[in-house]
Regions:
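Terminal, contiguous helix-loop blocks that mediate binding/assembly
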Residues: 246-250, 256-262
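Active-site histidine-anchored catalytic micro-motif
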Residues: 2-234, 238-250
């Protein structure tokens, strides 16, 4: 495979470049303020539901950034941790892969497993639109337990030291799935609270305590851990929303959060 082609264009986001660009321009028209994040949490649902929240997360990174985005997404099919070493197609153009950084991660390459996974792909148009010179290091995370998150964080940290890359880290995750909105909001905000002090063990404890069905809690944990090693001191919840804000159905929603680590 010489390029990872779009798998969910026309489903999760527009395939037409003009339509997609107009949509992203609308999403990025609302600025949250300072653009100084080391890492972010960004959702990966269809843009109609979570695109505005994702843009709020990416808006906390300066548009002048031209380094490497380490994008960590959960596998929705149970694959093991693996990386992709090829460029990624978007309707707005190709996002280049930082192959030297990816190789330094010492994680198995598996382009087949990346082929249909949407959790990483949904982030790419945001990167291409706002950071046209940036490269990517895509990581799919299969095992999301605490030790696995710490091991992945250590590999990312070692790769940063080895390559001296300027990086920003994106954890791709939605939060509660298919529960009443009051339940989603209560559980999600409860789980997010310890992230504000970069307290990953407490984050895991609260996820388990409430049974929060956040699909990318492992990527979140790995991202926050790396950011802490890079000097980050805290995280901020920039925006929280649910699918009910779009559909009007408050009985069964999915939660979305934009989180900035600084």
């Amino acid at each position: 495979m010489t390029m990872r082609t779009c798998a969910v264009a026309g489903m999760f986001y527009p395939r037409d470049p003009s339509h997609l660009e107009q949509l992203l321009e609308k999403f990025f028209s609302v600025s949250p303020g300072a653009a100084n994040s080391v890492g972010i949490v960004s959702p990966h649902a269809g843009y109609i539901y979570s695109g505005e929240v994702a843009a709020r997360a990416f808006s906390t990174i300066s548009p002048d950034f031209s380094g490497t985005f380490v994008v960590i997404g959960p596998s929705h099919r149970g694959y093991i941790n693996c990386v992709s070493k090829v460029p990624w197609e978007t309707p707005l153009g190709v996002v280049d892969n930082d192959t030297a950084f990816v190789e330094s991660l010492d994680i198995e390459t598996d382009e087949f497993s990346h082929r249909d996974e949407h959790s990483l792909e949904v982030q790419m148009p945001f990167i291409k639109y706002r950071f046209p010179r940036a490269q990517i290091a895509p990581i799919m995370m299969g095992q999301q337990d605490y030790p696995s998150a710490i091991r992945l964080a250590e590999k990312i940290g070692a790769a940063i030291q080895q390559t001296h890359r300027d990086v920003r880290i994106v954890a791709s995750s939605d939060f509660s799935h298919y529960v009443p909105e009051d339940t989603a909001k209560s559980n999600d905000l409860y789980a997010i609270e310890p992230l504000k002090t970069l307290n990953i063990p407490e984050f895991y404890r609260r996820i388990a305590e409430r049974g929060v069905s956040a699909c990318g809690y492992g990527p979140i944990a790995a991202m926050v851990t790396v950011c802490g090693h890079l000097g980050a001191k805290k995280a901020q919840l920039i925006r929280y929303a649910t699918s009910g804000d779009v559909t009007g159905d408050r009985h069964e929603v999915v939660g979305y959060a934009a989180i900035s680590v600084i």
